[in-house]
Amino acid sequence: SHKVWHETSPAVGKAKFPLVGDPTHKLTRAFDVHIDEEGLALRGTFVINPDGVIKTLEIHSNEIARDVSETLRKLKAAQFTAANPGQVCPAKWKEGAKTLAPSIDLVGKI
């Protein structure tokens, strides 16, 4: 299914990161998204940095599709904040847009 998704989706086709399948269900059980009764997993997207730290995760029931452009936006935000410590990407942030420096002065203003 990931192979077909990669071949048919213009956004996914450009992805330069792995789309992981899990035929043994080892990963889906480890991430607690496996549905034992059905023998399948919820739709899960996990962005994990090179140190093994989960930077973003999104889990949907199988009736709800994922938005690849939003996943890519979150991936770019994770990459940006890793390269720019002390900066925060606000909601709907796009690559090249302004970021924030966390401060008590921001509370209630964004």
Where are these regions (language model features)?
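Chalcogenol-based redox active-site neighborhoods
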Residues: 1-110
